[in-house]
Amino acid sequence: GIFPKIIGKGIKTGIVNGIKSLVKGVGMKVFKAGLNNIGNTGCNEDEC
């Protein structure tokens, strides 16, 4: 019927959006960490 299709679509969209936002969140964290490293003499703590 129509309703299972809508529900299935909603779940798929939800999962896709969840993954996208997760990737974005991780990407931003990595990006910010990279900027922080550049700000802090441009090396990781282990390498300094």
From Swiss-Prot:
Disulfide bonds listed in the record: C43-C48
Membrane-spanning parts: none
Tissues in which the UniProt entry reports expression: Expressed by the skin glands.
Keyword Disulfide bond annotated: yes
Main location: secreted
Record keywords: Amphibian defense peptide, Antibiotic, Antimicrobial, Disulfide bond, Secreted
Keyword Secreted attributed: yes
Gene Ontology CC terms, in alphabetical order: extracellular region
Cell compartments where the protein resides: Secreted
GO biological process: defense response to Gram-negative bacterium
Function: Antimicrobial activity against Gram-negative bacterium E.coli.
Protein name, UniProt field: Palustrin-3a
Annotated organism of origin: Lithobates palustris (Pickerel frog)
Upper taxonomic lineage: Eukaryota, Metazoa, Chordata, Craniata, Vertebrata
